[in-house]
């Protein structure tokens, strides 16, 4: 009986917390300014921050702001698949890092307020969409680390790479990526490119305030790859060695 009461109380708290988070217009979400790194993890995340060239779909937008308010995204319309342009307040790239099987893994994640998400017949899309790249290195200390491999969001599943071409990497650290519509699934995905894209202000998971972390974790519609259970599972799935 005591356990049952605790579970009911916890469910009530969760529902209350979830109800307190506000969705706001995607154009009004304020990105976080890139902070001066203070740990090896943060310095490594900056060292390997990729360039992103937008070939298809929206530019990346911020997903959450300091007070925990979340992007409401954009409505997907089948007959209106043109790009939704840039956020007037600036863009964002998120990161989270950890060790996995003696490799230092850095996930970079971009949020899109709408995207093509077609599998099967017809055309379909999502109001919220994430793309991510996981950079695998041999050390959390950026002074001693080197790039070992990369795992990318693909149209279906993940694409894993341990042999990188020099034309896709700047100075051995900075990946050149692009967003595109995949052949399989016709979904927004990532792949390597020769073109030099843009960078966005980086905010790491640890640098996010508690309100923003909690909002991203509890909002099931956003389904961010950075939240605890997804991040850990994705590292296992993405391991390329």
Curated annotation (Swiss-Prot):
Its job: Secreted effector that acts as a pathogen-associated molecular pattern (PAMP) recognized by the plant immune system. Induces necrosis in Nicotiana benthamiana leaves and can induce Phytophthora capsici resistance in Nicotiana benthamiana. Also significantly improves disease resistance of Arabidopsis thaliana to Hyaloperonospora arabidopsidis. causes an inhibition of plant growth which is typically associated with enhanced immunity when over-expressed in Arabidopsis.
Annotated signal sequence range: 1-19
Transmembrane regions listed in the UniProt entry: none
Origin: domain of life: Eukaryota
Compartments reported by the entry: Secreted
Keywords: Glycoprotein, Secreted, Signal, Virulence
UniProt comment concerning the protein's domains: The structure of NLP effectors is remarkably conserved with a high level of conservation of a central region containing the conserved undecapeptide motif AIMYAWYFPKD and heptapeptide motif GHRHDWE.
Segments carrying motif Conserved undecapeptide motif: 105-115
Intervals of motif Conserved heptapeptide motif: 125-131
Residue positions with a glycan: 144
Descriptive protein name: NLP effector protein 7
UniProt KW Glycoprotein keyword: yes
Keyword Signal: yes
Source species: Plasmopara viticola (Downy mildew of grapevine)
InterPro entries attached to this UniProt entry: NPP1 (IPR008701)
């Amino acid at each position: 009986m005591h356990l049952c009461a605790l579970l009911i109380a916890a469910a009530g708290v969760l529902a209350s917390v979830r109800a307190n988070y506000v969705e706001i217009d995607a154009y009004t979400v304020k990105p976080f300014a890139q902070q001066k790194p203070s740990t090896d993890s943060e310095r490594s995340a900056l060292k390997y921050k990729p360039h992103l060239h937008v070939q298809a779909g929206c530019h990346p937008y911020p997903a959450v702001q300091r007070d925990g308010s979340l992007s409401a995204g954009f409505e997907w319309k089948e007959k209106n698949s043109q790009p939704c342009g840039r956020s007037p307040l600036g863009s964002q790239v998120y990161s989270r890092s950890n060790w996995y099987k003696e490799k230092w893994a850095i996930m970079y994640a971009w949020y899109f307020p709408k995207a093509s998400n077609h599998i099967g017949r017809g055309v379909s899309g999502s109001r919220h969409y994430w793309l991510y790249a996981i950079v695998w290195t041999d050390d959390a200390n950026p002074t001693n680390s080197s790039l070992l491999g990369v795992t990318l969001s693909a149209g279906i599943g993940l694409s894993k790479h341990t042999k990188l071409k020099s034309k896709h990497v700047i100075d051995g650290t900075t990946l050149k990526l692009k967003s595109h519509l995949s052949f399989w699934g016709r979904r927004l995905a990532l792949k390597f490119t020769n073109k030099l894209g843009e960078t966005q202000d980086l905010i790491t998971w640890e640098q996010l305030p508690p309100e923003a972390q909690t909002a991203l974790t509890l909002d099931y519609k956003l389904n961010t790859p950075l939240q605890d259970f997804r991040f850990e599972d994705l590292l296992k799935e993405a391991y390329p060695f």
